[in-house]
């Protein structure tokens, strides 16, 4: 009897450099920032700016930041995504589980090719973006749709979002409670989501509404009052207006108004990465300390059992 799974779950994260070095970071950023879903400027104008100005400057600077959070096993985002895939495989023995990156390695299209070579008949693609955006989830959808033309015999579903999924919300809420039990509870809980250019939201991207729905669902699960939490957006890039309120200035204003301690969680990130570990856990903590306040960072769900069980349940329902 053949017991080899013919259904696969493919979890896809954003991507990461292969090492915390300027050349590796430049290669990664070149691929990431060349995606028209990410930067909509026509290539004729964008490429000279990207290769002539942005990569030479950001490559070394970003490499220094990656070096601060790099793990012995590699990039935090890759390490935790790989471990999460292993946890999913453990709770889904009747499925084959793989992981891939939209940018960098393991490349999404190559991973889809490997699944086809294994004889997989059905693939559920789960982008590790709880909230949908045309700049993230849709980019994965683009790659999958292009690949489908070469593999019409394989059924493929792409999960679009899980911003209010009950299992995921419960896992986030429980991770916050567990953090409070160990570290104590601060005066205010901050939800920090990755930012997005305001023009993208104005064009109809549902991301900000989904971020708000995620925060509200977690707040409801925790039973918090309106004065006990705040949300904002981080990781702004460039000079144009992004979604507001900006997370870090919001924290500063609250600190200057008398709030002395904050807990902070990033529900838009499935796994910890540069933006959560270096920008938030280190950077926000430093600037708040200058204002007489403290920040206690609550890690992402990463490869926790609760995370694996929540995602597995989503995949089985797809």
Curated annotation (Swiss-Prot):
Pathway in which this enzyme or protein is active: Porphyrin-containing compound metabolism; protoheme biosynthesis; protoheme from protoporphyrin-IX: step 1/1
Source domain of life: Bacteria
Localization in the cell: Cytoplasm
Enzyme Commission number, as recorded: 4.98.1.1
Disulphide-bonded residues: none
Molecular function per GO: ferrochelatase activity; metal ion binding
A single BP term in Gene Ontology: heme biosynthetic process
Keyword Metal-binding carried by entry: yes
Name the record gives this protein: Ferrochelatase
Functional summary from the UniProt entry: Catalyzes the ferrous insertion into protoporphyrin IX.
Catalysed transformations (reactions): heme b + 2 H(+) = protoporphyrin IX + Fe(2+)
Gene Ontology cellular component list: cytoplasm
Gene source species: Xanthomonas axonopodis pv. citri (strain 306)
Gene3D superfamilies named in the record: 3.40.50.1400
Gene designation per UniProt: hemH
Residues that coordinate or bind Fe cation: 194, 275
Keywords: Cytoplasm, Heme biosynthesis, Iron, Lyase, Metal-binding, Porphyrin biosynthesis
Membership in a protein family: Belongs to the ferrochelatase family.
């Amino acid at each position: 009897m053949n017991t080899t799974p013919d259904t696969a779950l493919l979890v896809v994260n954003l991507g990461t450099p292969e090492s915390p070095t300027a050349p590796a970071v430049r290669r990664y950023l070149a691929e990431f920032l060349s995606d028209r879903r990410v930067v909509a400027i026509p290539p004729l104008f964008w490429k000279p700016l990207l290769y002539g100005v942005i990569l030479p400057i950001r490559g070394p600077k970003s490499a220094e930041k990656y070096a601060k959070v790099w793990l012995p096993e590699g990039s935090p985002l890759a390490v935790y995504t790989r471990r999460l895939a292993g946890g999913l495989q453990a709770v889904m023995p009747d499925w084959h589980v793989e992981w891939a990156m939209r940018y960098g390695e393991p490349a999404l299209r190559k991973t889809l090719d490997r699944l086809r070579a294994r004889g997989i008949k059905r693939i559920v693609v789960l982008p590790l973006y709880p909230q949908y955006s045309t700049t993230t989830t849709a980019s994965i959808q683009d790659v999958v749709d292009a690949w489908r033309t070469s593999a019409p015999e394989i059924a493929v579903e792409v999960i679009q979002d899980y911003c209010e999924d009950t299992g995921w919300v419960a896992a986030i809420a429980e991770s916050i409670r567990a953090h409070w039990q160990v570290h104590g509870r601060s005066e205010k809980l901050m939800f920090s989501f990755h930012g997005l250019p305001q023009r993208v939201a104005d064009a109809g991207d549902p991301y900000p509404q989904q971020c708000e729905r995620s925060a509200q669902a977690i707040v409801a699960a925790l039973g918090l009052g309106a004065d006990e939490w705040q949300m904002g957006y981080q990781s702004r890039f460039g000079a144009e207006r992004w979604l507001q309120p900006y997370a870090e200035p919001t924290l500063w204003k609250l600190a200057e108004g008398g709030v002395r301690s904050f807990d902070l969680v990033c529900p838009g990130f499935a796994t910890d990465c540069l933006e959560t570990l270096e920008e938030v856990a280190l950077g926000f903590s430093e600037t708040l300390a200058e204002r007489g306040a403290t920040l206690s960072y609550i890690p992402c769900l990463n490869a926790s059992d609760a995370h694996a069980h929540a995602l597995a349940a989503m995949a089985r329902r797809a």
